[in-house]
């Protein structure tokens, strides 16, 4: 990349940053915000006795999110990857999929971003927010000083980094497909030098002993999960999500249109589009506490680069 291209990219990033700041101020004034207006599952059109695919195995936070959202009105299918869960819905093998979306400490779950971008016939119909309490666990009889290797999902490793530096600075880490997969691995290994960081319930499920609780950086740790369907939602909720595929210097025009439509930009995640440098796929989430209207959606989807992924309400579980 030459100096001219680098300057253009820096300028574009500056424009986006300034635009987001302006939007934040605007939404505080206009009344669109993250408090209130949250729909419950009762307000959504959920299929009875649904088949729900989720990022497994049993004992993951994704399973907890799925059970919280659907209750007893569903059968649950654990899958090894986010992509497998999404493909179940696309192929008609499941009515819904539940996947992790974003964590307050670890940021966006990259697999979720890539999975949504890759599918044209998948929609977001709900969101679940869970409090996350990461727990260190090992086989019975394990002491902290025994541990040489800590296994977890990438998010669990990132969220516990500060605690591990203080209490087991010499222990290595190994990423697993999920926190529950890490707990299962430790149970099968039967090795006191290996521990897992997972949800508290995974310890009981896999016969492990809890060595330390709340090893995440902060008690404010939360993860958001998407509920996906192959059916486009008929009703609009308080939130909506879009995919924008464009060059970096065009995304600010879309952000301004979101502002003009009276919507709050909640999050924006980007991934390289893959065809040439400077082109990206963006996941854009918007919100308005009074509910999003069809007119607002049409205003945003007027761009040829925009693909609508759904409008939905949010359920949050509290400790």
Whereabouts are the PLM-identified features?
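Domain-level signature for soluble enzymes in the chorismate/prephenate branch of the shikimate pathway
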Residues: 14-319
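N-terminal secretory signal peptides that target proteins for export/translocation
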Residues: 1-12
């Amino acid at each position: 990349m030459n100096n001219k291209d680098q300057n253009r990219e820096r300028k574009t990033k500056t424009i986006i940053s300034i635009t987001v700041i302006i939007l934040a101020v605007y939404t505080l004034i206009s009344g669109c915000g993250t408090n209130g207006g949250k729909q419950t599952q009762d307000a959504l059109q959920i299929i009875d006795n649904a088949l729900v695919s989720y990022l497994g195995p049993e004992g993951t936070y994704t399973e907890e999110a799925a059970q919280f959202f659907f209750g007893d009105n569903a059968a649950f299918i654990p899958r090894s990857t986010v992509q497998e869960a999404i493909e179940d819905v696309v192929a008609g093998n499941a009515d819904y999929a539940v996947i992790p979306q974003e964590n307050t400490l670890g940021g966006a779950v990259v697999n979720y971003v890539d999975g949504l971008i890759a599918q044209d016939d998948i929609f977001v119909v709900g969101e679940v927010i869970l409090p996350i309490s990461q727990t260190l666990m090992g086989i019975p009889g394990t002491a902290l000083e025994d541990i040489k290797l800590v296994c977890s999902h990438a998010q669990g490793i990132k969220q516990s980094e500060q605690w591990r530096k203080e209490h087991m600075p010499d222990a290595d880490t190994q990423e697993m497909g999920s926190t529950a997969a890490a707990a299962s691995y430790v149970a099968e290994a039967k090795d006191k030098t290996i521990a897992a960081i997972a949800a508290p319930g995974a310890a009981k499920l896999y016969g492990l002993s809890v060595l330390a609780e709340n090893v995440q950086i902060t008690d404010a740790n939360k993860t958001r999960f998407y509920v996906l369907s192959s059916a486009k939602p008929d009703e609009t909720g308080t939130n909506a999500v879009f995919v924008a595929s464009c060059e970096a210097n065009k995304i600010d025009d879309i952000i301004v249109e979101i502002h003009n439509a009276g919507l709050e930009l909640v999050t924006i995640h980007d991934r390289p589009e893959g065809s040439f440098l400077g082109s990206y796929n963006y996941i854009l989430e918007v919100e308005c506490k009074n509910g999003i209207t069809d007119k607002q959606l049409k205003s945003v989807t007027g761009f040829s680069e925009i693909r609508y992924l759904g409008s939905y309400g949010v359920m949050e579980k509290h400790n």
